[in-house]
Amino acid sequence: MLYLCMRFKFDIEKSRILKNDPRRKISFVEVQKIWNHYHYVDCRSDDPEQFRAIGWVKGKLHTVIFEIREDSEGEYYHLVTLWKSTKQEEKLYEKHT
């Protein structure tokens, strides 16, 4: 059996702000669970190269913007921002998963 270890990095202060934002109410720590289940990923922008992941966390669809970066230990996901998915993003998720 093969186990993949995904690494995530993010700004801890920004994560706290997102958790306390009444429109979001979720932190970067919690939203990492998107990668544990079916999720949809596409490229959001090329400069800088950023990706969008859409998936379920805490009973709601959420969208996370992230970058794939490297350090001395290898590749990791740098989480940039997150929000509750829009209607358009919900349709994308339904179409592709």
Where is each model-derived feature located?
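Ribonuclease/tRNase effector modules and their secretory precursors
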Residues: 1-97
